[in-house]
């Protein structure tokens, strides 16, 4: 006799989430390595505009800053790791602010003072910042080192490196001194606006995933994928450093 009370198992629609997250991380890195020589690459059209511009061009530089952040693979991967286990808006705001402060300081100071280092090395460190955050999310420091770095300080420090990487790249464009400071401020404002837009999209996606049982089950796999992406970026930059 057929059991009419039997209910078919519900499909686990979210079981592919960590795989999708990993594919996204790896796809971003492959696209970055194929399309850019450096993690802070700038589109050819934007390069020409930056090099030829003179005078205060507030809104165009706001647009360029926002575009850089939204298409910045390294920034997005690092920030995804930062907010991975943050649930309260207060905590997210604190960490994002720490990153933004660090990014702003070195972006402005690096260009205005002319301090410059090898861009490959800076971008390799930025790749390792992604590895660090993924390892931190996995509890690796406490398990293997017996020491837990201060997450807020680490976010500020890596924000300094992220900003310095962009400052190093911008200095290659021989920016006009006419309107330089207002344009840099506008660019930085655009970066922060782009960061808000990118984080909003990430938070919406993460919010849906966190409500499912698969989040805790597959968080480890997702952070391993994030770590692999960071190693790929760092390895690519070191290859460029030794072969350029």
What positions do the PLM features span?
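Histidine-/acidic- and/or cysteine-rich, low-complexity loops and terminal segments associated
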Residues: 2-71, 147, 238-244
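Hydrophobic alpha-helical transmembrane segments in multi-pass membrane proteins
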Residues: 68-73, 78-243
């Amino acid at each position: 006799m057929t059991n009419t009370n039997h209910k078919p198992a519900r499909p686990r629609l979210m079981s592919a989430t960590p795989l999708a997250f990993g594919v996204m991380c790896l796809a971003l890195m492959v696209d970055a390595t194929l399309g850019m020589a450096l993690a802070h690459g700038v589109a050819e059209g934007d390069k020409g505009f930056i090099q030829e511009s003179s005078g205060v061009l507030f809104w165009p530089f706001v647009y360029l800053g926002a575009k850089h952040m939204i298409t910045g693979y390294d920034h997005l991967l690092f920030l995804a790791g930062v907010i991975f286990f943050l649930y309260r808006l207060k905590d997210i705001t604190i960490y994002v602010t720490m990153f933004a402060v660090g990014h702003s300081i070195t972006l402005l100071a690096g260009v205005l003072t002319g301090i410059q280092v090898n861009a490959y090395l800076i971008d390799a460190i930025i790749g390792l910042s992604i590895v660090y955050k993924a390892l931190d999310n996995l509890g690796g420091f406490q398990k293997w080192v017996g020491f837990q770095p201060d997450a807020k300080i680490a976010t500020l420090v890596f924000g300094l490196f992220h900003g310095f990487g962009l400052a190093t790249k911008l200095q290659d464009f021989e920016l006009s001194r006419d309107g330089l400071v207002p344009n840099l401020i506008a660019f930085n404002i655009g970066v922060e606006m782009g960061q808000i837009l990118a984080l909003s999209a990430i938070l919406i996606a993460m919010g849906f995933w966190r409500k499912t049982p698969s989040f805790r089950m597959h968080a480890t796999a997702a952070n391993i994928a994030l770590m692999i992406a960071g190693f790929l970026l760092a390895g690519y930059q070191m290859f460029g450093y030794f072969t350029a």
